[in-house]
C-alpha cells in the first residue's frame, strides 16, 4: 500500500516514529522529488535473527578485521553514501527531506549508523531506525568489496547482544536473501512488530566507543539462543 504525502514538510520525527510503530515508512520517487509517500508492503522483508547466515568467505573477512567498524561516528556521511549513485543503482529514494528527517531521528537517539573504514576512508555502512526491540534497516552502501556486508554482520551481532527480536529490511533483494532474508505477509509482520514494541532492547549492549573485534561479533551470532 502506498499513500502520497504532498506536504512532506509536515512529517515530523515524532510522526515518523509513530508511523514505524504502525508498520509504515516513507520513501520518495527519486532524490529530486520533493514529496514523500507512505509505504506498507503486502509482503514484508525481514531477516530472522535466529537464522542469520554468513558465508565462509565473508566470515573470514569479518574475522580478519581488515576493515575498521564504528557505530554512530559518521551518520551524515553514511546517509550521504547511501544516497549516492552506485553500480547498478543510478537513482535513489533518499531526497533532501528524507535526509533531514533521519538526521533528526539520529539526534533523538532513534536512528543509528554502522560505518566501515579503510584507513581514514569511509568505504561502506548502513543506517536504520531503532524502536523497542525492533530495528528497521533503511539503506546500505559500499565502495569497497564486502564493506556493507561487514556492516550488516556487526549490526546483527549488536542486535542479538542487545535483545532485539526483529530486523526489518522492508523489502527483500537477492543480496539480502543470502543472509537469510524472507518475505512474510502483512498480518504476520504486524504480529511480530507488536511483540517487538513490547519491552526494551539495548543498542549499546556492545561498546559504542570502541571497535568490536570480528571474532567477537561472529561468536555472538554463532552462540545465539
From Swiss-Prot:
Its main location: cytoplasm. It catalyses: N-terminal L-lysyl-[protein] + L-leucyl-tRNA(Leu) = N-terminal L-leucyl-L-lysyl-[protein] + tRNA(Leu) + H(+); N-terminal L-arginyl-[protein] + L-leucyl-tRNA(Leu) = N-terminal L-leucyl-L-arginyl-[protein] + tRNA(Leu) + H(+); L-phenylalanyl-tRNA(Phe) + an N-terminal L-alpha-aminoacyl-[protein] = an N-terminal L-phenylalanyl-L-alpha-aminoacyl-[protein] + tRNA(Phe). It comes from the Bacteria. One of its GO terms (cellular component) is cytoplasm. One of its GO terms (biological process) is protein catabolic process. Keywords: Acyltransferase, Cytoplasm, Transferase. Its EC number is 2.3.2.6. SUPFAM superfamilies: Acyl-CoA N-acyltransferases (Nat) (SSF55729). It holds the Pfam family Leu_Phe_trans. One of its GO terms (molecular function) is leucyl-tRNA--protein transferase activity. The keyword Transferase applies. The keyword Acyltransferase applies. It is found in: Cytoplasm. Functions in the N-end rule pathway of protein degradation where it conjugates Leu, Phe and, less efficiently, Met from aminoacyl-tRNAs to the N-termini of proteins containing an N-terminal arginine or lysine. Belongs to the L/F-transferase family. This is Leucyl/phenylalanyl-tRNA--protein transferase. The lineage of its organism: Bacteria, Pseudomonadati, Pseudomonadota, Alphaproteobacteria, Hyphomicrobiales.
Amino acid at each position: 500500500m502506498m499513500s502520497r504525502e504532498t506536504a512532506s514538510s509536515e512529517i515530523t520525527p515524532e510522526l515518523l516514529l509513530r508511523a514505524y510503530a504502525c508498520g509504515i515508512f516513507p520513501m520518495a520517487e527519486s532524490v529530486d522529488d520533493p514529496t514523500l509517500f507512505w509505504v506498507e508492503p503486502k509482503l514484508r522483508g525481514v531477516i530472522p535473527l535466529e537464522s542469520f547466515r554468513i558465508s565462509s568467505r565473508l566470515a573470514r573477512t569479518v574475522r580478519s578485521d581488515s576493515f575498521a567498524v564504528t557505530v554512530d561516528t559518521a551518520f551524515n556521511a553514511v546517509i550521504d553514501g547511501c544516497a549516492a549513485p552506485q553500480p547498478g543503482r543510478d537513482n535513489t529514494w533518499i531526497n533532501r527531506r528524507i535526509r533531514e528527517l533521519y538526521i533528526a531521528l539520529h539526534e533523538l537517539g532513534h536512528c543509528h549508523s554502522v560505518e566501515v573504514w579503510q584507513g581514514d576512508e569511509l568505504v561502506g555502512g548502513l543506517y536504520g531506525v531503532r524502536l523497542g526491540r525492533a530495528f528497521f534497516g533503511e539503506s546500505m552502501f559500499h565502495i569497497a568489496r564486502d564493506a556493507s556486508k561487514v556492516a550488516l554482520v556487526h549490526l546483527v551481532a549488536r542486535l542479538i547482544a542487545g535483545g532485539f527480536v526483529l530486523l526489518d529490511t522492508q523489502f527483500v533483494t537477492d543480496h539480502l536473501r543470502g543472509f537469510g532474508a524472507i518475505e512474510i505477509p502483512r498480518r504476520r509482520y504486524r504480529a511480530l512488530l507488536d511483540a517487538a514494541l513490547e519491552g526494551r532492547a539495548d543498542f549499546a549492549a556492545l561498546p559504542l566507543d570502541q571497535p568490536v573485534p570480528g571474532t567477537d561479533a561472529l561468536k555472538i551470532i554463532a552462540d545465539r539462543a
